[in-house]
Amino acid sequence: MATAVTTRLEDKYVTIDGLRVRYIEQGAGPVALFLHGASLGSSADVFADNIARFADAGFRAMAFDIPGFGLSDTPAQQTVKAQRDSIPKFIDAAGLGKVALMAHSRSGGFAVELALAEPHRYSHIVVLGSGNLLPPQDEGQAARHQEAQQRADQMMAEKEPTLEDTRKLLQADTFNHALITEERLKVRNSRSVGQNFRNHVARQSAPQGGGSATAKPLWQRLTELKMPLMMIYGREDRAHAAERVALLKRQHPEMNIHIVPNCKHLVPWDAADEVLRLSVPFLRS
C-alpha cells in the first residue's frame, strides 16, 4: 500500500495569456506532465509525491495549476474550454516540446481531446480515474452521474470549507485515510479557500460547453488515438467505475486498462506505487 512521501518542490511560474501560472517539477529526462482535476482544492500539489517518484525513475516530472486553481492567476473566463486549452499553452510557455500526459479525473477527457486534435504533440496518455472516459451501463447513467457531480460541486460552493470539511472531502476520495497527512490536509485546504473558493463558485455558473468539438462520446473515440493509451482506475471509485471499466474492456479487450484494488478516486494517492510500476515501462515503450 502506498505511503505518503513528504516533498517540498520549488514554485515556478510561466506566463500564459497575461496570467501568471505556477508549476512544480523535479528530475531530468522525458517529460511526464501531470494534470489535476476540477474538484474544489485541486492543484499541482496533488502530485507532489508522484513527481518525486517519477523523477527518481528518470523522468522530468511536472504539474501545473490550471488558471483559476492553486497559486495560478484567475482568468476572466473560467470555462471548460479555457481550462483545456491552458494545457498546450503551458507546454509552449515552458518550452517542453512533446510530452506524455498523466491526467487525473476530468483532465483525462482534456488529454484525450487534445491528443485527438494534435497527436504530434503528445507521446503517451495515462488516464487516472477519469469517469468521463468510461461508457455508461445504461442509457440514462451518464446524465445521472453528471447531475450528481453538479450537485456535489454546488454543495461545495455553498460555504468556504473548514479544515475538517476538507478532511471529509479527502476521505470520500481516498481508500487509505492514512495518506491524508496533516501537511496534505493543510495544503488542500489552503487551495480551497479565499480566491480559490471564489473561483470554484464562479465556475458553477460559467459556460460548461466547449469541452469537445464533437457530439460523439469520448469513450467511443479512444481507439482513434494515434499514441499509446493506458487507463488506471480504483476498484472502489464512485459512479460504478469498476463495472464501467469492465464494460469498456469487454468492448475493447485490446485496450490497456487496469483496476487497482483498495483504491478510490484519488488514484495518484491510493495507487501511487501501482501508477509508478505500470507507467514507467509504458512511458519508455
What does each model-identified segment do?
Residues 1-34, 56-59, 96-97, 284-285:
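Alpha/beta-hydrolase fold catalytic core
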Residues 19-71:
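Conserved HGGG/HGGXW glycine-rich cap/lid loop of the alpha/beta-hydrolase fold
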Residues 48, 56, 63-102, 106, ...:
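Active-site loop/oxyanion-hole signature of alpha/beta-hydrolase fold enzymes
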Residues 112, 116, 125-162, 168:
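Flexible "cap/lid" loop of the alpha/beta hydrolase fold
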Residues 159-223:
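Conserved alpha/beta-hydrolase catalytic His-Asp/Glu region
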Residues 225, 231-233:
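Short beta-strand/loop motif that positions the catalytic acidic residue
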Residues 235-240:
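Acidic catalytic loop of the alpha/beta-hydrolase fold
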Residues 253-285:
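Catalytic active-site module of serine/aspartate enzymes centered on a nucleophile-bearing elbow/loop
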